[in-house]
Amino acid sequence: FGMKVIGYDPYMTQEKIGDLCELKATAKEVWEQADFVSVHLPVVPSTEHSIGREQFSWMKPTASFINCARGALIKENELVECLQDGTLFQAGLDVFEHEPIQESSRALFDLDNVIMTPHMAATTEQSVLNCCTSVANDIVAVCNGQEPQVKAQKPKF
């Protein structure tokens, strides 16, 4: 794509990530510089409803916001307001504050600058097959005294 990728992760170093992404010192720098802001966070007390008008106001006037992580990260009413008043150019969502979608999210359906899809893109035949194969291979590896290829890591929050 020829796209320059920038990001922020308080637990990652540029040395670890290599040239895949240019890490910024703060999340705000990413919001201010990116043409596409895509969030990838879990919902924990410190992140729940942590994204709203303030963050959207940092974005370029032509930037796009994408949330495929968790709906509860967003102050959905502020997202709607920013999309309506032009603070935010457009959004792509496949997660919502309340799922299944409730009447409180209805305003999103009336906006021309929002694309919404179901949160199930990873549930394809191939992805399920890959997941099952990976798990089976790692079970065999562990039973044979070897290290698994895919290891779960406890997140640090």
Please report, for each region that a protein language model flagged, where it lies by residue.
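Rossmann-like dinucleotide-binding domain for NAD(H)/NADP(H)
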Residues: 62-64, 68-157
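Conserved anion/nucleotide-ligand pocket segment
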Residues: 1-4
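Rossmann-like adenosine-cofactor binding region
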Residues: 10-106
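Conserved SAM-binding motif I beta-strand of class I
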Residues: 7
